[in-house]
Amino acid sequence: MIDELISIIGIPALAFAISTYIPGIQRKIEARIQQRIGPSILAPGFWAFFKFLFKETKAPDANLPKLYNLLPLLSIVVLWALLSITSLTSFHILSNEIGIVGLLKLEEMMYVILGSLAFSIMGWKMPFIDECKGTPFIKTLKLSLEQLGAVRSFKMITIGSFPFYLATFLPFVQKKSIFLKDIVGEPFLFSLAGIFGAACYFIGYVIMIKEYPFSITHTKADVIEGPTMELIAKYRALYLASKELLLIALGSLFATLYLGIAPDIENPITIVENFAIALIFPILATFVRAFSPVLLFKQIYPISYVATLIGVIGFIFALLGW
């Protein structure tokens, strides 16, 4: 019982502590690629979290302002639960493919809900809605900045992130089981299906974290911060924490699913191995971001289809046991 409590609290807490360094590492790598010095490693993540905590809080002009502000906390809880179930692989209610997909879908839905609630500009109530699309003509849809970001988030949920969920499914297909305990200790990556699945997973990872080139939900050119624009002060700190935690949580999930290395509190070396592998993903994503423009949906859809095709090939190989 004590070990389970330590796993539920300790593993996600350690992941969060490590994740605060990831934005700084990413910015440093990107700066070096662009022949700049860049900020200190602690500034973009660790110190930014505390900086936002001491900013002045403003209530957004939203239908449900309290719900809007607290939704990033829901995202943190979801990711905390995801890290917990990968360390407690015998917890059947959630430690399975259905639980993993369900939790991550909740995290994605946060952006759709956020964009449906707020109608202000940087915390200031406007005499008119910040309409960025549409006309006053009858039967013409009019959208605010946040609403347009929410529509884009919904498109990313339905089509963009599909390769990621397909990739999480492949290790379970080969084992003919949906439970995590059946794939832990089995390096699925070192198989033909695992190679295709890993390629599909990485493309899905970059889409899931909503970074360049898949940052259309909050591109600065039109919707600015999109659904999350009105998160201010301590609520912005919560959002920053959820973004950082997502970076390492999805990498940790790969280590568990594809290499069979679950962070076990009774075997500390597995925690080191799991998080070391998890850190590789945001670093690789940084190289993609440094050389990529923001893609439109007419470019995102083909990439998603190609990644899905790669995943389907891996799915066939997994069925064959290759």
Swiss-Prot record:
One of its GO terms (biological process) is anaerobic electron transport chain. The chain crosses the membrane at residues 5-25, 37-57, 71-91, 109-129, 153-173, 189-209, 245-265, 268-288, 300-320. It is a multi-pass membrane protein. GO terms for cellular component: formate dehydrogenase complex; plasma membrane. The keyword Nucleus does not apply. InterPro entries: ComplexI_Subunit1, NADH_UbQ_OxRdtase_su1/FPO. It comes from the Archaea. Keywords: Cell membrane, Membrane, Transmembrane, Transmembrane helix. It is found in: Cell membrane. Its main location: membrane. This is Uncharacterized protein MJ1362. It comes from Methanocaldococcus jannaschii (strain ATCC 43067 / DSM 2661 / JAL-1 / JCM 10045 / NBRC 100440). The lineage of its organism: Archaea, Methanobacteriati, Methanobacteriota, Methanomada group, Methanococci.
